[in-house]
Amino acid sequence: MKNSLFLIKDFISKETLSGLILFVVTVLAVTIANSDFGSYYFELFSTQLGINFGQLNASMSLLHWINDVLMAIFFLVVGLEIKREMLIGELSSVKKASFPIIAAIGGMIVPAILYISLNPDHITGFGVPMATDIAFALGILMLLGNKVNPAIKLFLVTLAVVDDLGAIVVVAIFYTNELHFEYFLYAFAVYSIIWFLNYKNVQKLTPYIILGVFLWIFIHKTGIHSTIAGVLLAFAIPLNKKADLEESVENLSVDNPLVKLEHALHNFSAFIIMPLFAFANAGVIIDFSNVIEHQLIVLGVALGLIIGKPIGIFSFTYLATKLKISVKPENVTWNDIFAVGFLGGIGFTMSIFISHLAFSDQTIVGAVKLGIFASSVIAAIIGSVLLILKAKKVEP
């Protein structure tokens, strides 16, 4: 279990730094997009890039290569983290898992309801306020330093892991284009082979990765968003639960392909993919007339993130404990839960990602992005103030 805690601390430290980098990159992208260099910025990410290999011809804009290919690697890392937590971490038992699972469910359902109540004619955007940007949220906690109880950080991480799983399910079910069933058969065949390797306890990562590339291609062709391939591959990577978890993390990595792959990709995901995604997607022209034109959509997203998230997380967990369905973690107060609920309202990169899937009209996407930025900042400020005030009360 020591190694499990070590992995969580390592995850927190990397995601925290990544969150700070994302903030800088976001400011840079918005600044460039609204400067004299804005046209070059948008032209860059509209550039068509292609691969021609035999019968394989793939051509997409640079933006789509980032959002479809690199984000599949990001979701591969997310999937690895989810599987690890479910097998040896904070989600490995019903007692441990129930509280953050219920918190995440509340933090997804209430924002979605608030959004839909305001936008019955643009219902596809309901997934935008459901998401949480774990890197940004942990970055805020890091800036607060020792004012934050370590137990709060652990709760936020486990909450975000479940939230990510929920986002994956939402993307797979609700943001799927026209389906091509013949490619489902190809994808199923490849995925069956991957699981056969897992069944045979094949420890080398190379065959999993090669087959994972084909899995991505076929899922991309099915009409399901191709990032789902990353999650499916992650769930099939073996993790040796019987390994001695008291050993050093280096030995654990050698014995466990899942941990080895997670460590190999985490820095690339946190410090290359996510900043690149933020830079490519955060550049939006600040046009308040556009926001006014789509004010109900923007308001639905804002209310979902700023109000829906904390109310959903707090009310669902409070009710669950009163009904004895779950138990609140030790050393975490209800004030902490409420404050973390606001940090859960920092949607940022994940909300931006879903906004591109939810809306085809780029003017709506631009307005929604501004709403996401403003809402995430407000939620971060409120959550931070609540945690600081709570810390001052407990100081001698």
Swiss-Prot record:
It is a multi-pass membrane protein. GO terms for cellular component: plasma membrane. Pfam families: Na_H_antiport_1 (PF06965). It is found in: Cell inner membrane. Keywords: Antiport, Cell inner membrane, Cell membrane, Ion transport, Membrane, Sodium, Sodium transport, Transmembrane, Transmembrane helix, Transport. The keyword Metal-binding does not apply. GO terms for biological process: regulation of pH. Signal peptide: none annotated. It catalyses: Na(+)(in) + 2 H(+)(out) = Na(+)(out) + 2 H(+)(in). GO terms for molecular function: sodium:proton antiporter activity. The chain crosses the membrane at residues 17-37, 62-82, 98-118, 125-145, 154-174, 179-199, 209-229, 268-288, 296-316, 337-357, 368-388. Belongs to the NhaA Na(+)/H(+) (TC 2.A.33) antiporter family. NCBIfam families: NhaA, PRK09560.1, PRK09561.1. This is Na(+)/H(+) antiporter NhaA 2.
